[in-house]
Amino acid sequence: MKILFIACYSPLINNSASIETLQYLNNLAKIDENEVHLLTVNFPKNSIYYDEYILSMLNEKVKMHIISGGKIFEKIMPKKPSNKVAVNSSQNNKSFIKSMLKKGKSIIAVPDMYFNWAKAASKSGIELMKKEKFDVMFSMHEPPSSHICAMKIKEEFKDLPWVTYWSDPWLKDSTRENISPVRRKYEQSFERKVVNLSDRFIFVTKANRDDYVNSY
């Protein structure tokens, strides 16, 4: 089976979502009949998020397609200090950047910081689909842009089976409690479309599953 696996958070970095992605990829790749392609965000080696050790744990059979998050995304991404002298100033800059990102995310990052990536990656995914003729597509939430990327591919290939993974709620996540009504309505239109186009769902908790069943 040829699988297109879409995840913003991949084994290029080290967080809980990337570890989940790593486990899924490795378990899928160890099945002899499977050919797994990963479509993900580019986290350069000089990014503070890049983790060579986690990446080394990824099954070498997985084919990676790494797409840039865009010029703005790569510009504001915190970088590793280039030398020892720069460590303190780098840490101060890192704290400043993080605080600014938190303030700005709710304004410019809708639904998240990877939306521009989703648009670019979906175009790459469409070309990949034409070439590879995938049997199934799998996308990982969090963040929502993984699903948005997959949604755009699904719109082009309506017969492609699409499995969506939900680690947390989207709109009802605690980080979105105070978003504006306009933004809520905008994001809900995406969430509804993703749910309507999905063929299969994987939920981490029964409560989350029941909420989506009741909502959609």
Name each model-derived stretch.
Residues 1-72, 200, 206-209:
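N-terminal subdomain of nucleotide-sugar transferases
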Residues 2-3, 136, 151-173:
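Active-site proximal beta-strand in glycosyltransferases
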Residues 41-119:
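A conserved catalytic-core segment of Leloir-type glycosyltransferases
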Residues 109, 121, 125-146, 160-163:
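Short N-terminal targeting/anchoring amphipathic segment
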Residues 161-163, 171-193:
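Nucleotide-sugar donor phosphate/pyrophosphate-binding loop at the beta->alpha transition
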